[in-house]
Amino acid sequence: NKLNDELLMETYQHKDVELLFASAKDNDKLQTEQIEKFIQRGVDLLIISPNQVHSITPVIDKAYDKGIPVILFDRKTDSQKYTAFIGADNVKVGKTIGEFIAKTLHGEGKVIEIKGLDNSSPAIDRHKGFVQALSRYPDIQLKRTLSGEWTKESGYKSIKSAIVDAKDCNIVWGQNDRMAEGAQRAMAEAGIRNVLYVGTDALPSKGGGRSCAQRQAACIVYLSHSW
């Protein structure tokens, strides 16, 4: 994880700083429990990437109310109880993708979107920006907005479940590269050709990210270094 690596590099320079990690693996309950344990331990600072907007908010509010500085990274909650937010403008990401697709289709065509985890702030904001961009092009039809979970398998399953609608679409946009690649595999298995696939992130991760982006028509790069 790039963030973890950079945090480690910085803390190596400060012998009196202890850095603790916890991975919730996209599990709301586990993330809540982990944050509770850090609160009980009396940590001096929390850096959190909330799995989903609503379910993690109460425990983050609790930490903030106890006077613990909270930095939200990449994802937000539905509360203003945090010290700082570090992340990209995901509404702008969605708008950029929407404009690219509109220009690629010359203002006319059919599109399918695969969202990330429904209640995660990047999925919400990217969809918002995407819809805003497409609203300027009345001849572009957003046929379906499918639910994924940021994984290649969820992209595959979501398209499989909507294969009838997918048959005559022109472009599939996955809100990240892995979902776009999963969709591409599902369409290929169904014998559907001549569809363009657009992804997002191009992060340097094993088995995805940049390697997925190379197999797509386009990908918007989601910056992750030195925010």
Regions found by a protein language model. Name each.
Residues N1-W227:
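A residue-level marker of the well-folded mature domains of exported/periplasmic proteins
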